[in-house]
A protein has these predicted regions:
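N-terminal pre-domain/capping segments
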Residues: 1-132, 313-392
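Active-site acidic/histidine proton-transfer and metal-coordination neighborhood
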Residues: 3-13, 90-91, 103-209, 213, ...
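Generic structural signal for well-ordered alpha-helices
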Residues: 7, 49-53, 77-84, 124-129, ...
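Hydrophobic faces of well-ordered beta-strands that scaffold small-molecule active sites
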Residues: 17-23, 31, 63-67, 89-96, ...
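Active-site beta-loop-alpha junctions enriched in small/polar residues
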Residues: 24-26, 68-72, 96-99, 144-146, ...
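A structural motif corresponding to the C-terminal end of an alpha-helix
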Residues: 54-62, 130-135, 168-179, 207-212, ...
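Structural recognition of alpha->loop->beta junctions
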Residues: 168, 200-211, 235-238, 309-323
Length: 392
């Protein structure tokens, strides 16, 4: 079978791929030392949405943009929804924020003070109200909660309070909505984090019910973690709800997905396909999303590169000859099984993807098309004055 014939067989699955982009990727970001401004950075959520729509226009891969509350707070979310739809995209996941208020210094959903816990719960109720207006499905919760020193907090008590708070929030989740709980092994807390790993997240969402899932951020693991195994396990348990794709060299670097280890991205996507999260045997509804900060590079090209990286590794993962791989595995042929796996990884699908795009009225090279479009120069000329959006 020729490479082109093999690609033709997987092309229909690529047609359905959607990678949600985060609104905050278009704003300024940085490290704990410095946030750098950049020309053309959005000043409003509408300008963020316009930039997200540009990514979708050139790639056909990003039909939704995630919101972050309160960073993207507006008076009229129904109008914001119409604005996005007029640009050809929709409003996606709503992300809560309980890490930038002084009241949450020692915890939010885990705090010992019931008034502060209720304040954090009420914020999530606000996010659910936003979802009702925007038509969003997923409420994503990442908690920057934990302790820095042994003895600082009651580990068991914090888990109990977290479970109670999540249960209260979950009661307000609609029948067509989902709660996804993200984990991160450290930072900003350094001794212990309240949701540090997939097991803790799974324990909480399993207790909540069938509309609660785990969000897996690829940068939120200790170095050397076998992330694809976690993917396989969560799909097996029916609790993988979404991805936050990014890349890392050391910690939670939030770099362009696939930049540090494209082979890892390939392995992850293979397990997504193998486990029914995407592709010919899909049974689970797993949302693909980026969570990245373009601290020094231009934001829109960074997002274009990111969604293309996910698409390319998805195509390669779909090309794995599953029948031959299974036969080699069952025969105990270690080297042949690895060879079959690596053959797919080393397949250069870029020319095939370029042709695939042209057949669908998209530019063969989205990055070159964007750079030649004049959009970047236009926003840099137009967005003068005002306060640039950013997470600080």
């Amino acid at each position: 079978m020729t490479q082109a014939t093999r690609f033709d067989r997987i092309a229909p699955f690529l047609d359905g791929q959607a990678i949600e982009v985060p609104s905050w990727a278009y704003g300024n970001s940085g490290t704990r030392f410095k946030v750098f401004g950049s020309a053309g950075t959005p000043r409003t959520v509408e300008e963020k949405i316009a930039d997200a729509a540009a990514v979708h226009r050139f790639t056909g891969l990003a039909p939704a943009v995630a919101l972050h509350i309160p960073w993207d707070k507006v008076d009229d979310y129904a109008a914001l929804r119409r604005y996005a739809e007029d640009l050809g995209i929709r409003l996606g996941t709503v992300n809560s924020n309980t890490f930038q208020d002084d009241d949450y210094k020692l915890g939010a959903l885990t705090h010992t003070d019931p008034k502060i816990r209720q304040k954090a719960i009420d914020h999530h109720f606000e996010c659910l109200d936003v979802m009702d207006a925007t038509g969003s499905r997923d409420l994503k919760i990442w908690l920057a909660e934990g302790t820095n020193y042994p003895g600082q907090g009651d580990l068991r008590g914090r888990q109990d309070r977290l479970a109670e708070s999540l249960a209260t929030i979950y009661e307000r989740v609609g029948e067509e909505q989902r709660l996804v709980l993200e984990y991160k092994f450290f930072e900003p807390a350094f001794y212990h984090t309240d949701v540090p790993d997939w097991g803790t997240s799974y324990a909480h969402v399993a207790a909540l019910g069938e509309r609660a899932f785990v969000c897996l951020d690829t940068g939120h693991h200790a170095p050397g973690t076998n992330i694809e195994f976690i993917v396989a396990q969560l799909l097996r348990l029916g609790k993988l709800g979404s991805f936050d794709f990014n890349s890392r060299f050391y910690a939670d670097d939030d770099l362009i997905v696939g930049a540090a280890d494209p082979y890892q991205l390939f392995r992850i996507l293979f397990e997504v396909i193998r486990g029914g999260g995407f592709g010919p045997e899909a049974t689970a509804d797993v949302a693909f999303m980026l969570d990245q900060c373009h601290n020094i590079e231009k934001k829109i090209p960074g997002q274009i590169r990111s969604v293309l990286n996910v698409q390319e590794m998805t195509a390669r993962a779909l090309l794995v000859d599953r029948d031959a791989l299974t036969a080699a595995q069952e025969a105990g042929d270690v080297l042949l099984a690895n060879e079959i796996f690596m053959d797919a990884f080393y397949t250069d699908v870029r020319p095939l993807l370029a042709a695939w795009r042209e057949e669908r009225g998209l530019p063969a090279d989205p990055m070159r098309a964007y750079l030649a479009s004049g959009y970047q120069e236009q926003i840099e000329a137009d967005r003068i004055g005002g306060t640039q959006a950013g997470w600080n």
